[in-house]
Regions:
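C-terminal cap of thioredoxin/glutaredoxin-like
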Residues: 3, 8, 12, 19, ...
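Compositionally biased, proline/threonine/alanine/serine-rich low-complexity intrinsically disordered stretches
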Residues: 46-65
Length: 268
């Protein structure tokens, strides 16, 4: 499917009140986009169509193998949402600086301050048009997030960035972070994702979701959010603490320096 002009207007209108307030809340802004997405989604109609008619006749009992739970909206977060500090990161999985930022800064932060409940990490996809595979990588991450495996695939993508950037075999390296059963679930979600993945455009036009690809709208909502921040380069991060939000910063920062900043906030 393609976004119509009316749909684009509804999406922007739904999030506009939050955007004009700026980054004034510590709560992740992705929730606003999920609400906006619901405006455009025919979910309620589909649910009605899928609801069986009531009957007074009891259906015969059958034993079936337990089915995999239906995938839900992707949760691309690590840590406890009640942590005093929230850090939102806009990232491109193929961006070398993003890979370096993850390996040398975010990994240590996750092991130390996220694990201890001090920081809540929120990932936003901002795949750049200049990278051949960044949009596809975002699809894998979102599909994994739909089945509760985001941290595992997030790490697998960054750990193997140089390899899949060279050979384009994302599937092989994503599999290293998942059990065989979870990998099959992720593959099933992406079954209809055969065309080009959405990426941020140089001219800032809104990318179009592929019909039959359930993860594309979530990537697009991150791109729209990043454009409004605005994201000028990847990685870009925004930090929230006690109702205060600190302006978006781009580029690389070491963990010791970031940790010192967090400690200063926590001491207030």
């Amino acid at each position: 499917m393609r976004w119509s002009d009316a749909q684009e207007e509804k999406l922007i209108s739904a999030i506009h009140p939050l955007l004009v307030r700026g980054w004034s809340s510590r709560a992740p802004l992705a929730a606003a986009f999920l609400a906006a997405l619901a405006i455009l989604s025919p979910a309620s109609k589909a649910q009605t169509a899928a609801t069986p008619a009531s009957s007074n006749t009891a259906a015969p009992a059958h034993k079936h193998p337990a089915a995999d739970p239906a995938p839900s909206a992707p949760v691309k977060t690590i840590g406890n949402h009640t942590a005093p500090i929230t850090m939102e990161v806009f990232s491109d999985y193929q961006c070398p600086s993003c890979g370096n930022f993850y390996e040398t800064t975010l990994r240590s932060m996750i092991q130390d301050y996220v694990a201890s409940g001090k920081v809540y990490l929120v990932h936003h996809d901002f795949p750049l048009q200049m990278h051949n595979y960044s949009g596809q990588a975002a699809r894998w991450a979102n599909a994994a997030a739909m089945v509760g495996q985001f941290p595992e695939v997030d790490a697998a993508l960054f750990d193997n960035q140089a390899k899949w950037t060279a050979d384009g075999d994302l599937e092989k390296y994503v599999a290293t972070g998942l059990s065989p059963a979870n990998f099959k679930r992720v593959q099933a979600i992406l079954k209809g994702c055969t065309g080009p993945a959405p990426t941020s455009k140089v001219d800032h036009t809104l990318p179009q979701p592929e019909a039959g690809c359930p993860v594309d709208p979530y990537i697009i909502q991150d791109i729209v959010l990043g454009t409004q921040v605005p994201v000028q380069a990847t990685p870009t991060f925004v930090i929230h603490y006690k109702g205060q939000s600190y302006p978006a910063s781009s580029g690389f920062i070491t963990w010791p320096i970031l940790k010192q900043f967090f400690d200063t906030l926590l001491s207030q």
